[in-house]
């Protein structure tokens, strides 16, 4: 009874906190009439009919546990005692009871199966349009149905994924459509608290049949270092697609806008011939006079506006955020931003929001980034998975650099987590799975990695791609890991060559002594040789000088450092090894894990050598698990 009452009190306090901070929370099913929800939903989406990207977070129903036939359109979800109304993003693990029978790494919280359903109507002017259902992330095995038809599935808990659902929808302003989503979280699946369910944003992307492809605009400023202060070249590569059954003659009109939406370039227009159900890519070069640079102090943002015209009619308008900034990693002088040497004062970050769980609430994410900025941090490593779009948007706007990490482990489970992404890493995508951007026969790791790079390639905050972390755990046959690294390097560089690639190598002494018998060091060499990528080293900061001596052409980054053991608010000088009698550790930064360093020791190793580009301390915020 005491445990239950404590939990109830905690829930009340958290609800009050979230309401005061503007963070939305799911409403209990018994408190909201189902008809009211459906009415509001219809009104909201009719109002948004002119939007290209429609927020689709409102008006969902949720059931914890598997339910037979819940994918069917006519399934009865009216029982409010079983199907609660909620707003996404949503984590269905955080509201469950913790149990010591669950793994500590996941905060003793369960996984399980959850069903989401959404009823909605679409206006008649949507008929004939291209309609894409886009998920920014769902943990972890996600199966999507539209009006009873399965459109596909996704098996990584952190990548964005989407489906073209146009042909499955009824757009007449009165007939209800139903989207059903089954999310299965089999445990153990993670070395940290992952959460469960549709924990990131969902949106509908509604366009004309002739439109800019999803993630179809790539913006670079290849000559910025020499052109800054004058007329700067903006190179724009645009993919346009035609979902109709007839050839179309179209035009692409591209303009650079400032943060207020004012044009700062002359428009560039080019013709494009689109075959039926075809896609074409065009390149345009625009000039912007003396643009304001993006930096951590002044994160100036711009937009590339792309209009697709057929005749004189504008069929689609797409706006892509970018920033004018140039980066460099040097084997002797480290990292520079816009020509100025800067140490990356970074932290590693898991994605949970404490008592809110894994739900990617905008206000909570912006609060975290703001707090890190206040303490002097200028970079985040998204340990150890693809970040949310919300986090990257916050970093773009607030001036925080990002090491954008896609994977933790690869083809083998880590720490006994038999249900992690290794179950699908090397499996191939089936032909009936209609994931946008996927090709039947591609491996899941290729699809996930490419999805990450395609989505994030224009974010000025992203300065490093990271493809893995401490790869040795659980690996019984590393013979293919060097080839995996080569594959992933080629996948990334086919999309973006403006950022270096790294991996968090936890055998830095192997790098120092050139012991390439260890496959981790072979992976690092694939990325760092010839000065192409970054040699990423986890912990053992004392090895940095040796790595530099052994490989003077390598560019070096401390991908994970420190890991001090401090208890918040505990300040004592009388403890032994930093621990008091009640197992609290002093916050005077005198204690660290055996494989790490105190925060000040790690920082000393970072600043004493110019060739060390920076460090990412473990960890920026406390996390569950």
Indicate where each model-derived feature is located.
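Low-complexity, Pro/Ser/Thr- and charge-rich linker/hinge segments at domain boundaries
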Residues: 38-39, 54, 201-216, 325-340
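Beta-strand-rich binding/interaction modules
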Residues: 146, 230-273, 282-284
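Active-site mouth of glycoside hydrolases
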Residues: 158-167, 187, 192, 326-534, ...
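Bacterial Sec-dependent N-terminal signal peptides
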Residues: 1-13
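Sec-dependent signal peptide cleavage junction
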Residues: 2, 19-35
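Accessory beta-strand-rich segments of carbohydrate-active enzymes
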Residues: 63-66, 106, 111-215, 220, ...
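Aromatic/acidic polysaccharide-binding cleft in carbohydrate-active enzymes
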Residues: 177, 560-578, 604, 609-625
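Extended carbohydrate-recognition surfaces in non-catalytic/accessory domains of CAZymes
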Residues: 32-134, 189, 195-198, 210, ...
């Amino acid at each position: 009874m005491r445990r239950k009452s404590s939990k109830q009190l905690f829930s009340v306090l958290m609800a009050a906190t979230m309401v005061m901070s503007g963070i939305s929370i799911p409403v209990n099913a018994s408190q909201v009439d189902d008809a009211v929800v459906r009415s509001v939903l219809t009104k909201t989406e009719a109002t948004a009919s002119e939007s290209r990207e429609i927020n689709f977070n409102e008006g969902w129903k949720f059931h914890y546990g598997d339910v037979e036939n819940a994918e069917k359109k006519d399934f009865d979800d009216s029982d409010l005692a079983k199907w609660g109304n909620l707003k996404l993003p949503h984590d269905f693990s955080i509201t469950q009871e913790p149990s010591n029978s669950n793994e500590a790494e996941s905060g003793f919280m369960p996984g399980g199966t959850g069903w989401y359903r959404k009823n909605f109507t679409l206006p008649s002017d949507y008929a004939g349009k291209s309609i894409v259902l886009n998920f920014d992330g769902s943990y972890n095995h996600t199966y999507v149905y539209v009006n009873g038809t399965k459109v596909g599935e996704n098996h990584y808990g952190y990548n964005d994924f989407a489906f073209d659902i146009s042909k499955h929808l009824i757009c007449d302003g009165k007939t209800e459509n139903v989207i059903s989503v089954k999310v299965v979280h089999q445990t153990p699946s993670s070395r940290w608290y992952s959460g469960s369910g549709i924990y990131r944003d969902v949106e509908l992307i509604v366009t004309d049949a002739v439109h800019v492809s999803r993630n179809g605009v790539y913006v670079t400023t290849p000559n910025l270092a020499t052109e800054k202060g004058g007329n700067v070249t903006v190179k724009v590569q645009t993919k346009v697609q035609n979902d109709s059954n007839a050839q179309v003659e179209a035009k692409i009109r591209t303009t650079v806008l400032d943060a207020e939406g004012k044009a700062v370039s002359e428009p560039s227009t080019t013709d494009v011939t689109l075959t039926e159900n075809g896609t074409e890519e065009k390149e345009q070069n625009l000039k912007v006079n003396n643009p304001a640079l993006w930096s951590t102090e002044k994160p100036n943002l711009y937009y590339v506006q792309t209009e697709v015209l057929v005749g004189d009619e504008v069929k689609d308008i797409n706006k892509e955020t970018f920033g004018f900034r140039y980066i460099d990693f040097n084997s002797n002088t480290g990292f520079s931003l816009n020509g100025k040497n800067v140490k990356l004062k970074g932290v590693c970050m898991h994605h949970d929001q404490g008592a809110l769980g894994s739900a990617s609430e905008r206000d909570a994410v912006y609060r975290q980034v703001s707090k890190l900025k206040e303490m002097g941090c200028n970079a985040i490593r998204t340990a150890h998975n693809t970040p949310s779009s919300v986090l990257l948007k916050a970093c773009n706007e607030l001036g925080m650099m990002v090491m954008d990490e896609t994977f933790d482990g690869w083809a083998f489970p880590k720490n006994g987590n038999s249900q992690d992404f290794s179950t699908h890493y090397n499996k191939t995508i089936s032909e009936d799975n209609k994931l946008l951007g996927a090709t039947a026969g591609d491996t899941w790791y290729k699809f996930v990695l490419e999805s990450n790079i395609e989505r994030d390639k224009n974010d000025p905050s992203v300065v490093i791609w990271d493809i893995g972390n401490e790869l040795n755990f659980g690996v019984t046959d590393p013979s293919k890991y060097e080839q995996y690294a080569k594959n992933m390097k080629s996948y990334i560089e086919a999309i973006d060559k403006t950022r270096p690639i790294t991996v968090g190598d936890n055998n830095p002494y192997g790098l120092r002594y050139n012991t390439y018998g260890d496959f981790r060091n072979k992976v690092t060499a694939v990325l760092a040789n010839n000065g192409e990528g970054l040699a990423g080293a986890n912990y053992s900061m004392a090895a940095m000088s040796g790595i530099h001596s052994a490989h003077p052409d390598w560019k070096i980054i401390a991908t994970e450092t420190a890991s001090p053991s401090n208890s918040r608010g505990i300040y004592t000088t009388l403890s032994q090894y930093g621990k008091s009698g009640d197992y609290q550790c002093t916050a005077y930064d005198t204690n660290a894990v055996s494989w790490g360093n105190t925060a000040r020791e790690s920082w000393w190793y970072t600043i004493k050598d110019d060739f060390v580009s920076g460090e990412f301390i473990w960890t920026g915020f406390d996390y569950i698990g």
